[in-house]
Amino acid sequence: LSWNGKYLLDTYSSVTIPQVIEIIQTETQQKKTILKSENPLEKYAVGTTELIELKANDGTPLYAKMHKPKDFDPSKIYPVLVYVYGGPHAQLVTNSWLAGSYLWMPVFAHNQKYIVFTLDNRGSANRGFAFESGIHRQLGELEMEDQLTGINYLKTLPYVDSGQIAVHGWSFGGFMASSLMLRHPGVFSTAVAGGAVTNWAFYEVMYGERYMDTPQSNPNGYEKSRISNYVNNLKGKILFIHGSVDDVVVPQHVLTLMRTSVSQKQFFDFFLYPMHAHNVSGYDHVNLVQRILDYIVEHNVNKKYWK
C-alpha cells in the first residue's frame, strides 16, 4: 500500500498462473498490469500440478496436491512418492505456482514417471487455532491419521500402484516419515527421513513443550511418539540422513535411534553430512536431493517382489 493509501501493489500466482503483478487504485479499483509472466517451464520436461480436497475422519476438509508426469497416461500404473512435513508453522499446499512445491518434485514426477503427493494434515498452518491445536500433547497421532487418509485416497486411483508408495520428509517431516514407516508397517515400501526428531524429550524446550507439555506431565505422549519403540516394525527400506553439527535437531536424535536399531538387530540405512547443520545447503544440497531420489527409485518396489 502506498504512503497515501491511493495505490496497492498486488502480486499473485496460482497453479495455472506463474506470476502477475498489478497496481490497483484503491478508490476506483482500476488495475494496471506491470508484469504477467509466461510459463517458464513450458518447454521443459516438468510434471503437471493439481489440487485435491479430501475429508479427515471427523469431516474436516484437508487439502492436498499431486504432481503427475507431463505425459501422464491414466491407463498406466505409477509408483508414488509422498512428501510430508505435517508440523505447525508450515503450509505446503497452496493455490500458487507449482502449488508451493520445490521444483524437483514435478521434475522428478516426469523424469521417473512418478506420482508425487503432499497433504496438509491437521496441525499445519493457516487453518486456524482449532485445526492446529488438536495435536497438543500427542504429536504424530492426528497427523498420521490424516496422512493415511491421503494414502487411502491414492489407493482408490486406478493408476496408482499401492505396493509402490514411498515417503520422504525433513525435520518434523523426518519425524513423520519415520513414524509412518515404522508405526504403519507395510503401507510404505521405502522411507527417507532427514533431520528427524526421534524423541521429543531431546528437542528444544520452547517448541517441544509448547506442543507436548513437559515429559513429566505428559509421559505417555512422549513415550508413544518415540521412534525407537517401533524399530522392530520395519518392513521395507528406511534411510536416515542428518547433519553432523545439526544444532536444531541435535545428532543425539538419530544416533540413539541407530544404537537401538543395532541392539535389536535391525538394519537402518544412515548417511551423515559432515559439518552441515539442520539444513544441508550449498552445492552439497544437490548431492542430498540426488541421494534421496536415487534411494527412493532403487528401493520403492512393489512388495510382491520383496525377497
Predicted regions and their residues:
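Serine-hydrolase catalytic core recognition
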Residues: L1-K307
